Regions:
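Generic secondary-structure signature for well-ordered alpha-helical cores
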Residues: 43, 47, 51, 55, ...
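Short secondary-structure junction/hinge motifs that connect adjacent elements
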Residues: 53-73
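Internal helix-loop-helix
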Residues: 11, 74-134, 138-143, 187-190
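Intrinsic disorder at enzyme termini
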Residues: 1-34
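Mature N-terminal segment immediately following signal peptide/propeptide cleavage
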Residues: 29-51
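Buried hydrophobic positions in well-ordered alpha/beta secondary-structure cores of metabolic enzymes
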Residues: 35, 46, 76, 83, ...
Length: 190
């Protein structure tokens, strides 16, 4: 039995204001064999696919980063927390953090991976309606589609509360028009 299966996940900084018992504490010794195998797969992926090709990545070779994300998708590294019903692995937050650790030393790939799996996919997973989840999550989980994210605006910087850009439904009701300007879109280069 997985020792973490019966534990309740603590959200964000909740540990600061909630009584937490010692047995609720998670440590690396609590990882399952499956989680350890996933971590090893990350290390091998980095060693075989990324580290020997750092120059290609750093020189922004066209298609290289997207190709790495494709391979990560084939390995399941883009779908760790995505529910199984949408083509994901449906694994725990702890597992996703283990994956992040495993690819953390891969330079800009770790940023592209984090933008895809975190700020690009999680908002749909957490807040999307059923139709949005069914449309986007399977293709994001497989790597067929790449997620990107943009917060920064010329007059607001990265202050989300000062942003002015909006998506406004057109008069025909067929699509949205973006009003305003965004800058520095993570993962937009591919």
């Amino acid at each position: 039995m997985n020792p973490t299966a019966s534990r309740e996940a603590i959200r964000g900084g909740e540990f600061l204001i909630r009584k937490t018992l010692p047995e609720d504490t998670f440590s690396p010794e609590d990882f399952s064999e499956e989680q350890e195998m996933m971590l090893q797969a990350c290390y091998e992926f980095a060693e075989q696919e990324i580290h020997p090709n750092v120059e290609r990545m750093d020189s922004l070779e066209e298609g290289f980063m997207a190709g790495l994300l494709d391979k990560a998708g084939e390995m399941g590294l883009l779908s760790v927390t995505v529910p199984e019903e949408y083509g994901g692995l449906g694994m725990s937050f702890n597992t996703s953090m283990l994956i992040a650790e495993g690819i953390g030393g891969t330079g800009s790939f770790s940023t592209a991976h984090g933008a895809h799996t975190g700020i690009g996919t999680l908002p749909i997973q957490y807040y999307g309606n059923a139709e949005q989840k069914a449309k986007y999550l399977p293709k994001l989980a497989s790597g067929e589609w790449k997620a990107c994210y943009c917060l920064t605006e010329p007059d607001a910087g990265s202050d989300a509360n000062s942003g002015k850009t909006k998506a406004v439904l057109n008069e025909a009701g067929t699509h949205y028009l973006i009003t305003g300007q965004k800058m520095w879109i993570s993962n937009a280069g591919f």
